[in-house]
Amino acid sequence: MELLHLRSPRRIAFARLILAGLGGFLALGASYAIVPPLVKGELGGTDVIVGWTITVFAIAALLARFGAGLGIDRRGARLVYAVGFGFIALGGALFFVAQNDSVLFVARALQGIGQACMFTAGLTWAVYLAPKHRRGQAISLFGLSVWAGLSLGPVAAQLLIDHVGLWAAEWLLVLAPILALVSMIGMLGPPVHSESAGMSFPREAFRPGLGLMFGGVVMAAIVGFAVLTFDFRDGGGGAYVIGAYGAATFVGRIVLGHLPDRLGSYRTGVLAFIFALIGISIIGVAPTWWLACVGAVICGAAWSLLFPALALMAIDRTPAHRRGAALAVYTAGFDLGFAVAGPLMGNVA
């Protein structure tokens, strides 16, 4: 992979960017295994409340996404990236004192704000570090931190819940982003365009954002309700379905990450949509968690192609000083997908 052969300090900065992102998404991934037992156990809530925690997270991320994009263009990706870790850690800390649904909603909102800042700034940073003909691959490789965290987080949290207790899993929500924040000290960052950056959002990013909304719905269905669904269907194993999805996306980013640059963003996006529909259909009818893992693997591979392909559509026609705003609009589609899917899937469950 050409990106791995970039000269220092860009190569070092790219590796550190991925490792820092892993810490943030490890915490976010862990929360998906923690919320269902917390809501239905200690808080005495329902599946609908679980669904609304996803929606609150998504709405907070959506609203914060636009401010994060403008902040990246005007104040720099480094600052916005660091702020994201701070919000994730603060939201995780509230899990320890969540005695009712309202406090949990606030915690999830803070995590959503943190995700918006961290994810948008991280993508902008990755694109800056990569050569133009490898931007799709750079987005894919940055996605390694996302999907490694989302695959390892639920499994790690579930193991801690099963063998130690819910309180032990909640520590992941705080410690992981704090360590990530410390790890990014001194990293090479992109320049700040405070004078040339505007206050509007590029139109070129709106259509790719709508396509990404579909991916958000699929992901919300898997990571938000796999635990509850397979507790009912098969007596457990939902966390492993989430893990299979994240692991497949992780591997797909490595093996397939070059395809958007080689095949083109449009052709790659169409293929990804087709396979995503096949995968989610398998999960929908699977009677056992291990069969659902097959569908999750297909969905994960499709997502590993869909996200960078659509991202390339969003940034290729956008000037460098507006790239943060463009990626903010684009990734907002992901939040919209989560916001729509949360209450819908909660009522279906």
Predicted regions and their residues:
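Helix-to-loop junctions at the C-terminal end of transmembrane segments
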Residues: 64-76, 252-264, 349
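Paired small-residue
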Residues: 102-110, 290-298
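C-terminal membrane-cytosol helix-exit motif in multi-pass small-molecule transporters
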Residues: 174-193
